[in-house]
Amino acid sequence: MIIPEAPPPPPPPDPTPTPSNPGVPAPLPGVYTDKGEAPRDEHFRGLIALPIRDMDGLESTLRSLYDPASPRFRKYLSTDEIKERHAPTEADVKVVTDWLVSQKLKVDAVAANRLLIYFEGTVGQFNDAFHVKLRYLSRKPPQEGNQPHLVFGLLEAITVPKFVEERIQALVSLDIDEPVEPIQPADNRDVGPPKEIEKGYTPKQISDAYGVSKLHAMGFKGKGVKLGVLIGGTYHHHDVMDFWQVFGVARKDARVVEPLGPPLLRIRESNLDVQWAGAIAPEADLVVYAAPDARNTSMIYSFNEMIGRGEVTVMTDSFAHREDSEPRAVRYFYMYSSMFAAAQGITVLAASGDSAGVDVPASSPYVTAVGGTLVGVKDGRAVWEIAWEESGSGTSLNLAAPEWQKGLPGIDSKRGTPDVALNAGMGYWYLWLGGWYSNIGTSFASPVMAGLVAVVNNARESQGKPPMGWLNPLLYTRKDVQATFRDITEGGTPKYKAQKGWDMPTGWGAPDAEGLYRTMP
């Protein structure tokens, strides 16, 4: 008997200092202004991303999952299958977390799909570990009226040992702590309908405009579908329940998941997202993933965690940020995370933004970007619809145009947005701390589209069909699916005009829920 030789021992970890890609902003004229070094005792929290394993294999799987001619069509991967095939290994995660701990940093969480590590410490500990000096930058928001706020920034690349650099994708985010605001209860007794109801749209009017009411009438209201809503902070429970009650939406309360602990503040945006997603799909199981605040670290982790846990089949994110003001690592991480969603059969929808530019996470080709229109609704139907001048639109700075977008107007080598569009320029009603407000934005359009998808998935399930999952490949390649969209040919942004067929301000146009149900294979 020949005894095989033992394999040689692995080489020792290479400690050579190696530059790595930071997802932390640098000074940028008109966006980020340097305010000097951050004090060493300041607290930070951040995210490190690890790379997808076998990217070529994942891309091949995605092509087959969304090819009607493939025997693998819509045979989505489970969370366990995608981790086994494509998630970073537990061993690699341990190498990185052990190194962080050795640098006196605290590791608080590892994402369910192992794509992210959440860690914290002081600025001094970070500077020593990564051989940099963190700075304060003042960030100017692109929307008028929003006040600048402080963020961390860098003037140089981080440096880590080579054995760490080989195992990470990027430092994706680094954030200052959000000031804790007291979450006061609101007195919502005797809340009735808005006094001047004609100044905003109701859930019934929007459902009529986009064909959702037709599916409601057929008995499909989202039953059995888990609809995910990503929010920053928390929403006001009584506002949400009263909104639904006033507008005749009979539904159960949302279930709230807090991936990083309890909320630090209440955010108006979160109220409207939950109210409208739940109203359009009244029988869907609403699952709200509540980040502690709306900073990148909290939102990116919670976005990915909703995907990693794999319990929803459609999700919406209205917390959009201009792509040109986000570091490259942020843009790419949203793409990698949403690739996992596509493989799992999760439809990811995101507001395309309200500043006529390109936003993240909508710039990811694995996300369906929801742009904006202005719609007129009368007698239970849309009577006119044009492109909204602030509809987030354009081509990505970095992310490549997928094959199914090449050759479209304005598309050269980069991904174009949006993919679809719904009302964003005419007011929607929402309830905030017991008071009625009518407001605009793609922040409404994305949860409405998510509710629409949930209702369509409910109808598909009744026919034995799986959820639609990643919408984009079939939306861009199926003429019968495109034909169900209301083509928007008038209006536009300062840069792009609506035209026949796909265009930058509105994508393929406005969806019709019944048409999508009838045509999507």
Name each region found by the language model.
Residues 2-7, 11-110, 118, 123-372, ...:
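Substrate-binding/charge-relay-adjacent region of secreted/lumenal peptidase catalytic domains
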Residues 384-401:
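Metal-ion-coordinating, acidic/His-rich active-site neighborhoods
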Residues 380, 434-436, 492, 501:
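Detector for glycine-centered tight turns/loop "hinges" at secondary-structure junctions
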Residues 361, 388, 404, 430-431, ...:
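Short clusters of hydrophobic/aromatic residues that line enzyme substrate/ligand-binding pockets
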Residues 376-383:
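Short acidic, Gly/Pro-enriched loop/turn segments at secondary-structure junctions
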Residues 453, 457-504:
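An often Trp-containing, charged/polar helix-loop segment at the C-terminal end
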